[in-house]
Amino acid sequence: MKLTLLRHGETDGSRRDLYYGAADIPALPESLAALHENAAAYPRAKRYYTSGLLRTEQTLQALYGDVPHVQLPGLQEMNFGDFEMKSYQELKDTAAYQAWITDVEHNVCPNGESAKSEAKRS
């Protein structure tokens, strides 16, 4: 069996260096256009899966068109809770962020999850 993992197209969140995982933000139109333009370079598969988030659905569509696929919410990225859509600069001096960043594997983001719980879920 061969498994190929692809990350979704670029988002405003990635461009602005924001923490986001659970936020259902779209991929940028220019990113989707570039993916579509270069789709022939990406491997084809017998089965396709997405996390169900908009950016993953858009990326699949840009690369492969209307292929049948399965949405697996367990593939969603880490839920950063109260840190979602915020930057390091916004968070760095807060006690909650400092508590979390000391051990991201085990410490839980406020109203979010730890890296360990995300890995277990995935």
Predicted regions: what is each one?
Residues M1, D12-G13, A41-Y42, P73-Q76, ...:
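Short linear sequence motifs
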Residues A34, R121-S122:
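Hydrophobic alpha-helical membrane-association signature
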Residues K2-V67, K116:
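Active-site-proximal alpha-helix that buttresses catalytic centers in soluble enzyme cores
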Residues L63-R121:
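Phosphate-handling substructures
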